[in-house]
UniProtKB/Swiss-Prot annotation:
The gene is ttcA. InterPro entries: Rossmann-like_a/b/a_fold, TilS/TtcA_N, tRNA_Cyd_32_2_STrfase, tRNA_thiolation_TtcA_Ctu1. PANTHER family: AMINOTRAN_5 DOMAIN-CONTAINING PROTEIN, SULFURTRANSFERASE-RELATED. Its cofactor is Mg(2+); [4Fe-4S] cluster. This is tRNA-cytidine(32) 2-sulfurtransferase. A motif (PP-loop motif) lies at residues 72-77. The thiolation reaction likely consists of two steps: a first activation step by ATP to form an adenylated intermediate of the target base of tRNA, and a second nucleophilic substitution step of the sulfur (S) atom supplied by the hydrosulfide attached to the Fe-S cluster. Belongs to the TtcA family. Its main location: cytoplasm. [4Fe-4S] cluster binds at C147, C150, C238. SUPFAM superfamilies: Adenine nucleotide alpha hydrolases-like.
């Protein structure tokens, strides 16, 4: 008999509770920073459960030995790294982690923050300098958004670094809202049904892209990051631009969630329950040879 979602969540919470009893977070430098409040503990357990849900649901651990974890200095990537280190410290993530920051040459970028922080928590890391900022400023017309080109240049460099470090996966901090916003951007502006996949094989076929925060809410990650007092580095390149399509999607989703609480989770579940015969794409369903289903 298939368990309900609430039963599955309860079982995962029991598992995390049992692991907590056998695990002293104070033994690790990262976890010494953790607040001891009940509310934070609930938040942390929820995020850990959601990461493990993504691991199990999308087979993220299958064949994995070494991951390159992209760390930008924002709340999402800091939280991702902390949660992965949490699971690894418990023995629940049998994968080597390498944290990586790509310094893209943005003016006034605080170069010392990430190296100092990553060294302080004892994680293997690599800081790479590539001046993609100048390329983006040169190639993108005034008034246009930088996000697409900036992302492609960053991704290409991260692929290269992952190969150089012998990694089999690049792990990114995209969360529930990122996935929903991308879906609606493609829906409204691209005329297609597509979003960010939780697991993707790159075009060359040698690296997997993983998004373990697929089920995590942005608000939860913001609360987690604030409680952990991560040294956040703002993005002056993309964050300074107003009126982006993604911002419009974010505002739309926030308004829907405000008026109808729980709709974001419902929309995310919908992306995992696709019925090709009830859409209009003949590449996904053979409408030409459609015949009545046999009667019992």
């Amino acid at each position: 008999m298939e368990l309900s979602r609430s039963s599955q969540r309860e079982m995962m919470d029991v598992a995390v509770d049992a692991e907590d009893n056998a695990f002293d977070t104070g033994d690790h430098r990262l976890f010494a920073r953790m607040p001891s409040s009940v509310s934070f503990n609930k938040l942390r357990k929820r995020l850990l459960r959601q990461v493990r849900q993504a691991f199990d649901g999308f087979g993220m651990l299958k064949g994995s030995k070494r991951w390159l974890v992209g760390v930008s200095g924002g709340k999402d990537s800091y939280s991702l790294l902390a949660l992965l280190m949490d699971l690894k410290w418990r023995g629940l993530l049998p994968v080597e982690l390498i944290a990586c920051n790509l310094d893209q040459g943005q003016p006034n970028f605080p170069k010392h923050i990430l190296p100092d922080y990553l060294a302080s928590i004892g994680v293997r890391h690599r800081i790479e300098y590539r001046d993609t900022y100048s390329i983006v400023k040169e190639k993108v017309p005034t008034g246009a958004t930088y996000c697409s080109l900036c992302s492609r240049l960053r991704r290409g460099n991260l692929y290269r670094i992952a190969r150089e470090e012998g990694c089999d996966a690049l792990v990114l901090g995209h969360h529930r809202e990122d996935i929903l916003e991308t879906f609606f951007m493609n829906f409204f502006h691209g005329g297609r049904l597509a979003s960010m996949p939780a697991k993707l094989l790159n075009d060359e076929g040698d690296l997997t892209v993983l998004r373990p925060l697929t089920y995590a809410a942005e608000d939860d990650l913001a609360k987690f990051a604030a409680a952990m007092e991560f040294p956040i580095i703002p993005c002056d390149l993309c964050g300074s631009q107003d009126g982006l399509e993604r911002n419009a999607m974010k505002a739309m989703l926030a308004d829907i969630e405000r008026r109808m609480p729980g709709r974001k989770d419902t929309m995310l579940r919908a992306l995992g329950h696709v019925n090709p015969s009830h859409l209009l794409d003949p590449k996904l369903f053979d409408f030409q040879s459609l015949s009545p289903e046999p009667k019992e």
